[in-house]
Amino acid sequence: MFDFLDKNNIGKDYKNFLLISIDDIPDYKAKGIYLRHKKTGFEIYHILKDDKENLFAFCFRTISKDNLGTAHIMEHSTLCGSEKYPLKEPFTTLSSTSLNTFLNALTYPDKTVYPGASVVHDDYFNMLDVYADAVFFPKLDYATFIQEGHRLEMDENGKLSIQGVVYNEMKGNYSSFHHVVFDEQINAMFPNSYPSFESGGDPLEIPKLTYEQFLNFHQKFYNPDNCLLFLYGDIPTAEQLDFFDERFISRIEKKYNCKNEIKNYDSKLPLIKDEIQELKKLNLLEKSSYKKVIAPDSGATGNFVSMNWYTGKVDMEKYYLSEVLFGNDSSPFSLALKTSNLGDDVNCGNFGQFAEEFFSIGLFGVKKDDEQKVYDLIEKTIHKIYEDGICQEDIDSAIMGIDFYLREVNRYFGPPSIQIMEKVLKSWMNGNACNSNLTPISSFEKIKQKIKTDKNFTKNLIKKYFIDNKVIVKFVAEPSSKFFEERNKSESELIKNLEKNLDKNQLKKDLDELHQYQQHIETPEETSCIPTTKLSSLNSKIERPVTNLQFIKGFDGSEIPLFVSKEETNGIFYLDVLFPFDRLEPKYFQYIPFLSNVITNLGWNNKSWDECISESACVMGDVWGKFTTGKLSDVKEVQDYISKYKDYNFYGRQWLGISCKALTSMADKTLSLLAEIITTMSFTDKNRFGTLVQELISEKKAFLVDSGLDYASKRAKCLLGPLQALSEILNGISQLYTVENYTKNSLRESLNIFEYIYKECLKSGGIVHITADEDSLNKILPLLEKFVQNAKITKLLPAKKITLEELKPYISQNDAIENKNIQIINYDSQTGYAFVSSPASEYLSKESASEIILASWLKSHTLWDKIRTTGGAYGSGVEADSLEKTLSFWSYRDPNPEKSLEVYLESLKEICEKDFPKEDIEKTIVSCYGDVIVPVLPKDRGARSFTSMIYGISPDFKQINLNNLFEVTPQDVKNAAKRLYDLSQKQNQKAIFCNKSDKSIGNNIKIPL
């Protein structure tokens, strides 16, 4: 048996895979195994770790050299059928029948990555099989190219338009000020190099891509000697190599004519073709430059102005310097920018996506004539910080922040292994050792030693990266209403030029063939080629995280509920202190979101806000405000469950909270400071409050387009009940009107309101929740009674009942909602969002289980075909929510959102007559089960368990829901379709988020910002 961890085997091969190196990776408690196939050049790096969530990722170096978006269209198209899996979209079939915890495809400026992850052994290999066949043996037929990339469509009047999934997705990208700004800033830093090109594609360039160019791209880049396969998890290396050897190696050798061993197959470093190496070269500026561009005015509050410096290859010292200068609002550079009154939002840091990194210091919301003032401020601040030096408190807070970040595991975009993959690919892609970036903890320990022994260490970094760094790129982006006008004009010209050489008969033939291809419904026999996990092999018992309820003596002598979640948190504890806001008059609810944002940012105990933030950064990992809303189901099981502790008044409440996370070694200081924060909160600093208002407006405007679906969903459902109305008031379009009012009301008036709300919430009593590991709990639990006393937490008072009628006056433009069931949110955007909601069955019922299965089936079959494949939207979805008793449909980045509204209800009607094959239903149940078993990080498991408990959801109920899912039959699903269709005809609510130029009949809603 070949031992891949025996260093004596380095230089030996296993089934033609040469073992090049074995790396110890103590920072991740793992080993790294680097291999290269001697004949194909195929490289593998396996991080072997005791983690059942295994991940694979095929990576190809696909270097952008233009804005055609070829890599992006290829990423979509490879997943649309292959030799072994000749379906329309095996990716969709796979994702709808597998237990994946992550399944995606990602396009970067320099690479394309195809990752998948699962906690189930057989399911992992099923996904690996489909993906390997897709990337090496795709169909790439013409129909796929024009469906995913671009095509001309002709309406009934003969009018031409450009369509395509990628085309419409990227139109959404070009609708956002911030998206365009960051792309253009990178363009300024790396002119005529691959980062300066839009790897996703510019919609004005995408239609110029030919089918021949598309095929040549795959031939050029999708070769085994340009493929890097990243593996992670506990499945043995030998088993993975056996799989590849049995399923793919001989086929790859035959297709790519790999007869002999490749040159330099035993190279210790990654092999990169000369042609690709040339494409990867970065053209760095040799002297300072200035660039000004225009960007869409949607999402902008003024100009974006920045200064930028090249900083070289990746290293930890730049991360440390960035944390010192910009880590929080009180950090020296952040403070100077935020208090300058020259802009409303800071954008600073070391940007490390490429082989050459760069520091950027910038401000959003700058007035047109103030750009030189910003540059003067930045230069002045650099020299002042350098000359005065960095205070010890800023260094300590930076060290605390980085230590905390390196210890805490987070699940940002998929499993934590995705973050490790990114680190590996950054070095591997560029010809460096795969483990180069896998020593963050040990690298930072070296930095800390340098800080201790060299008092000028931080100062010298400022000199190195700023004072002595003479190439400076100054960049300005100006929002302009002409941006869309010019792009729309260019699009019209593009269509005219395409029309000149157009054979309309050939176009009609191509479109007829495409539509026929799209409308083909694959039979169970056809889809049976996709490997699946059998329903009978699944474990029907769910993980049961437990939050225990204890009581500690409150400030008033009462019993205060203490919720304790024991999880493996690696010496970190997470503490939540919640106070109900549901005893307030409804007119105050609208202020809760911003209040939760500012309560830890205004200062406390008569200290300035920056002094307070600096103090907390030296003690805690973070401290923040939040709000939590929800409701209790009225079903008997839930009411019985809550009966034991009902008199303690914590079930089904609406909460304002203050949370923190800290190292257990800092528990005493953390609890003391948190009690001080809660009891001495300040609401006096008008200047700071004004700055936070401007930041809020900037943030809301920046994410308006990206949040379009959220706004549409909340608007559509806002009259279904009190909780939905509250959600619209707190998070919907109505909240944007509240945000606008902060600029109209006096700052003192708003602060008085906030202070009143905060004090009233504290008077209403509170509860405490902690998530920590056993050792941490043993230390911290004995300290919590003193903390509760110091924080003056008292017995919870009962909630006041809130009705829908009481909330309606605080829903903006509510008078027209009941008269017109289509809510139309108008905003400058080149794509839109659609949302429809209708009634569904109640929590814990067998009917709700069948509706969940129906929704999942609809999402991956009918709606995927009609909304995405045929309609050209980037995506669509369906959800049956039994707690809310709603069925919801939606689309996003949709070229025709109003039409999608019709498709949803038509689709529901169509499937009422459908007979569902048993195999289809079982596959869908398997997919839904996959959603249940996605690994949850310990801190999140504790938070979820606590939230479930206070809203009356016990682990037993989750088990009942899963049992009900397992028992769903095809007839149950058919009955669900008929039931939901009948309910939708009696009541449905619709909303779309679309361009102002779209003419739709309904209640038109203007966005105030």
Regions found by a protein language model. Give the residues of each.
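M16/insulysin-pitrilysin zinc metalloprotease superfamily fold
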Residues: 81, 116-158, 162, 252, ...
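Non-catalytic accessory/assembly modules
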Residues: 7, 81, 139, 143-179, ...
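Non-catalytic terminal extensions that flank enzyme cores
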Residues: 2-55
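C-terminal regions of mature proteins
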Residues: 2-10, 233, 398-556, 560-565, ...
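Structured mid-domain segments that build the active-site/substrate or prosthetic-cofactor binding neighborhood
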Residues: 303-393, 556-567, 573-648, 747-751, ...
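M16/MPP (pitrilysin/insulinase) zinc-metallopeptidase core fold and M16-derived inactive scaffolds
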Residues: 48-133, 175, 196-199, 327-343, ...
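His/Glu-based metal-binding/catalytic segments typifying zinc-dependent metallopeptidases
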Residues: 45-52, 57-59, 167, 171-172, ...
